[in-house]
A protein has these predicted regions:
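C-terminal motif of bacterial Sec signal peptides marking the signal peptidase cleavage site
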Residues: 9-13
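Domain-level detector for secreted/extracellular nuclease and nuclease-toxin modules, and
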Residues: 14-303
């Protein structure tokens, strides 16, 4: 297995806006971006939280942001593969965020086994007995299929902090040609990424609902949360500017082949209301407001 390069941080404030985490360390609030994440003493001045794909970090409680980095900078100038917000009290992943562009496609697929992040989490911050979810698949939030350009990046997607329990009928296939609604959403996102020009990028934040009892199906053995809903916040940057949309679906134990992706597509603003998460907070406020309030299905082929 490839050696992992990991970093962890725990808090966030507000600040400057950068695509790749090279923003200011001053901690000053950009007047054009009042809700952005800001590197500070509390989070070790970690610049990764200023990347475009990041949402606003949750305040209160005990959270850790785990930034999974590659040794190579061939695919990302800062070596970032994907990042996770981990709730240490709930012992659950809140979201995974990452970038997609043409450079992430290659020949490597499912090169690793599942493993725990014992480097960044202490024994009381995760349930180590749940290496397998009885009755559920281990659902990658950053999929293995989105990281096929190198063995190292693919192997990192198998860390258990990047997993949520998902029904096989929601995130799998069968021999009769059925495919889960969630996996169809992921496949569509991958198709959009495959059509990007060499200078275009898709920014993604995905996860399941863990913050409200009404949005939880159950707890495995009374412990591990099974989210009732799953979502994707999607931001595309191209020569035409920014476009945004989101997917939202309840998790059920049925194939739902008659349901279209369009019926689960919403604006990012609506997704924020449903999740309580401020997505793409590192965009300038005027750009963020425009792309989040509008969902134009005509610019998203395949819906």
């Amino acid at each position: 297995m490839a050696v992992l390069m990991l970093s962890a941080l725990t808090f966030s404030a507000c600040g400057d806006d950068e695509d790749g985490g090279n923003g200011s360390q001053s901690g000053q609030v950009d007047k054009k971006n009042k809700n952005a994440n800001v590197p500070s003493a509390a989070n070790g001045y970690n610049k990764a939280i200023q990347r475009r794909e990041f949402p606003a970090l949750k305040q209160g409680g005990k959270q850790k942001v785990l930034v999974y980095r590659m040794k190579s900078t061939a695919y990302d100038k800062d070596g970032v593969n994907f990042s996770v917000e981990w709730d240490c009290n709930k012992r659950s992943q809140r979201w995974t965020c990452y970038q997609m562009h043409r450079g992430y496609s290659g020949k490597y697929s499912r090169v690793s086994n599942f493993y725990f992040d014992t480097t960044n989490l202490t024994a009381d911050e995760y349930y180590d007995e749940f290496n397998y979810f009885p009755g559920y698949d281990r659902g990658h939030i950053c999929p293995s299929g989105d990281r096929t350009a190198s063995e190292e990046m693919n192997a990192q997607t198998f860390v258990m902090t990047n997993m949520q329990p998902q029904y096989h009928q929601f995130n799998g296939y069968d021999d009769s040609g059925n495919s889960g609604l969630w996996v169809r959403m992921e496949n569509q996102l991958r198709k959009w990424a495959d059509k990007l020009s060499v200078t275009d990028t898709i920014f993604v934040c995905k996860g399941g609902t863990i913050d409200s009892e009404a949005n939880i199906i159950t707890r495995i053995n009374g412990k591990l949360i099974v989210p009732k809903y799953f979502y994707m916040a999607i931001l595309r940057k191209s020569s035409f500017g920014y476009a945004g949309m989101a997917f939202w679906s309840d998790q059920t134990k049925s194939w739902r082949m008659n349901e279209t992706l369009h019926s689960h597509a919403i604006s990012i603003s609506e997704l924020e209301k449903r999740t309580g998460i401020d997505f793409f907070c590192n965009l300038p406020d005027d750009v963020e407001a425009q792309v989040e309030k509008t969902f134009n299905s005509s610019v998203w082929s395949g819906l």
